[in-house]
Amino acid sequence: MRILCTNDDGINAPGLEIIEQIAKDLSDDVWVVAPEYDQSGVSHSLSLNDPLRLREIGPRHFAVKGTPTDCVIMGSRHILGEKGPDLVLSGVNRGRNLAEDVVYSGTIAGALEGTMLGLPSFALSQEFSMETGDRPVWETARKFGPQILRKVIDVGIPKNTVVNINFPACAPEQVVGVLVTRMGKRNLGFLKIDERRDGRGNPYFWIGFEKADVVDTPAAGTDLAAIAARCVSVTPLRLDRTDDAFVEVLTATLK
């Protein structure tokens, strides 16, 4: 099995080393194609107006000056040659990708691009917290990643589906279990715009987050609830985002 690994944190991110180790537990034919620089939050963007620059880091290791989507396309359609990959792994992301994070995440997008190319694809993310000193406990992803991947690969992933795996911010021995979940929903009211001034007095802005005064209790069965309970969350996500129920309503309304 030929595995293509990518991420959105960049070619030098520690999580990329973890995903490569996980991949090598499954196969000895592992390739790494990752962004030259941090691409967190770029979602499924594709570079159409800028050329892609490719740099070979070492054997089967390449950096692309582009997005995670660019990396998967370059890896599958150019770097790996005619055979291409059999599996795409994206991650391990530094931080969780839960609920609405899925829309923004370059890690998820790398896996989605693999799915769009007809390849079984997984996104893996490691939560961290103040308790861990903002340092992800990579050992948790390292331990649970291979066994979960093997089981899902054996059963098979439906066409147009990507599997999103999140590991809780605790040591491996503190993990309660593995739960299959659905996407959660959180209050995005804590998004804020931070306005500052440069040395010339001109304004510039950062998008940031305000700490919530009240922590919502996540709905049962969601990825948010699983991580809060120190469980590994495994969420199958569909590429087709059509709201089938509303299709019927609109059809009746607009006919």
UniProtKB/Swiss-Prot annotation:
Query: What does the cofactor section's free text say about binding?
Result: Binds 1 divalent metal cation per subunit.
Q: Name the Pfam families for this protein.
A: SurE
Q: MF terms per GO, please?
A: 3'-nucleotidase activity; 5'-nucleotidase activity; exopolyphosphatase activity; metal ion binding; nucleotide binding
Q: What is its EC number?
A: 3.1.3.5
Q: Where in the cell is it found?
A: Cytoplasm
Q: Which reaction(s) does its UniProt entry say it catalyses?
A: a ribonucleoside 5'-phosphate + H2O = a ribonucleoside + phosphate
Family the entry assigns: Belongs to the SurE nucleotidase family.
What this protein is called in its record is 5'-nucleotidase SurE
Q: Which organism is it from?
A: Nitrobacter hamburgensis (strain DSM 10229 / NCIMB 13809 / X14)
Gene encoding it? surE
